[in-house]
Swiss-Prot record:
It is found in: Cytoplasm. Its main location: cytoplasm. Belongs to the SIKE family. One of its GO terms (biological process) is response to wounding. It comes from the Eukaryota. The keyword Cytoplasm applies. One of its GO terms (cellular component) is cytoplasm. It holds the Pfam family SIKE. This is FGFR1 oncogene partner 2 homolog. Residues 12-186 form a coiled coil. Residues 193-215 are annotated as: Disordered. The gene is fgfr1op2. The keyword Coiled coil applies. It comes from Xenopus laevis. Keywords: Coiled coil, Cytoplasm.
Amino acid sequence: MSCTIEKVLADAKELVERLREHDGAAESLIEQTTTLNKRVEAMKQYQEEVQELNEIARHRPRSTLVLGIQQENRQIRQLQHENKELRTSLKEHQSALELIMSKYREQMFRLLMASKKDDPGVIMKLKEQHSKELQAHIEKINEMTAVMRRAIEMDEQRGDREHNRIIKLEQENKRLREILQITKISFLNLHKEDASENSPHSAPVPNTDLILRKS
């Protein structure tokens, strides 16, 4: 029976070590999530500044407007890629945590079964010790999960706003180009009329509407 207890204790220690390793990975993931949150906040501030400069941007050349849209698209794609990587890491850590929890419950069950013929005080003390360590790891994983979900929601909301604003800018740019084209045509027609009136050899152009009315 002592061999069984020793084996169970060794397995429990191994599980604790694995939990510590995953705890380190979770800390790294939390740091990445914090960095992503800071970048999201920076993008929000950038969006507010861009909205304040919308009036000025309308009078800028089309190339400047297109360049700004391209830069925003690159930033959105980069954030979406990082968000996807963080989602994948979160799923991997959750799967690993579920596996460790399953192994831990199995070991504790074996330990409790073996404790029927051994000192229950030692077994309960060991159980409490490992339960505290496991609970600490679970709390950190839950904290990481909450931060990740908040970052994902913020990123999705910001991405939708950026997408709608880009669509509006593209529509506005299209209207401005149409107005510019109409202005160019009107200017050319006016220039032709002025040239015809100032030319001494130009023959008078009959008024088609007037001829039709007389007929």
